[in-house]
Amino acid sequence: MQQMTIFVISDSSGETALTVAQTAVSQYPTIQVSYQRFPFIQTDSILDGILNLAKKQRAMIFHTLVSPKLSQHVREFAAMNHLQQFDCIQPAMDVMHQATGLEPEGVPGLVHNLNDTYFDRIAAMEFAVTYDDGKDPTGLLKADIVILGVSRTSKTPLSLFLANRNLRVANLPLSPKTQLPDELWQVDPKRIFGLTNRPEILRKIRQERMLSYGLPADSAYSDTAKITEELAYAQKLYKKIGCLVIDVSNKSIEETATLIMESVDYDLIPHSLQD
């Protein structure tokens, strides 16, 4: 069965774009689709982080962004990176403009009330983008949750998904040859989650990754022995830290996120609000 990933990006709840995507997909029953939803996106930095993730996953994009600037950015990014995208709102607004001669308000979320939860979510999304992939280890000390894992264990999409649940997440890639930041040892183990996978599944994921770059599938990156070594190193580290370990093999992002949200001690992160 053919598989596809669809990103739903919106400056509001994303219900409209999700409904359009699901309606279109329903006409193709032989395709297995994974949806990743990113609501309340209103800044360039967050949008860029999501678009780069879409590029990595070769995802199709359905979006409702009332800002012409952000909407155009999605279209241009998709064209430049050979991604399929569908704008679910700008064409409709253009028709309204032509029919009435009036300019749109250009204000996102007019049909939704903004509250503290909304602003917490925006802050969490900004945090996830800033402290993705170990870019700044100081984020480990500021995060509600720290996610560890070797390459291609879904750290970034998981971080963004949890950010949509108002959790501030930093993630750190693991490799036997990479020195761990000192900040990691200052984080409460109850806030750390280690991801693992089966070598054969991870090998396939990495091979597909190489092919998406137009490179040979078989390389040191997708070598089974190297992957096994990386996973063993990660497992040893998790045991030393004393953190919860989650096997993400054959789990969706949503399933892994649910396990984390059910396991996290919210008394340690009082500023994070849950829906």
From Swiss-Prot:
The keyword Transferase applies. ADP binds at residues 149-156. InterPro entries: Kinase-pyrophosphorylase, PPDK_reg. It is an enzyme of class 2 (transferase). It catalyses: N(tele)-phospho-L-histidyl/L-threonyl-[pyruvate, phosphate dikinase] + ADP = N(tele)-phospho-L-histidyl/O-phospho-L-threonyl-[pyruvate, phosphate dikinase] + AMP + H(+); N(tele)-phospho-L-histidyl/O-phospho-L-threonyl-[pyruvate, phosphate dikinase] + phosphate + H(+) = N(tele)-phospho-L-histidyl/L-threonyl-[pyruvate, phosphate dikinase] + diphosphate. GO terms for molecular function: ADP binding; ATP binding; phosphotransferase activity, phosphate group as acceptor; protein serine/threonine kinase activity. Its EC number is 2.7.11.32, 2.7.4.27. It comes from the Bacteria. Keywords: Kinase, Nucleotide-binding, Serine/threonine-protein kinase, Transferase. Belongs to the pyruvate, phosphate/water dikinase regulatory protein family. PDRP subfamily. Bifunctional serine/threonine kinase and phosphorylase involved in the regulation of the pyruvate, phosphate dikinase (PPDK) by catalyzing its phosphorylation/dephosphorylation. This is Putative pyruvate, phosphate dikinase regulatory protein. The lineage of its organism: Bacteria, Bacillati, Bacillota, Bacilli, Lactobacillales.
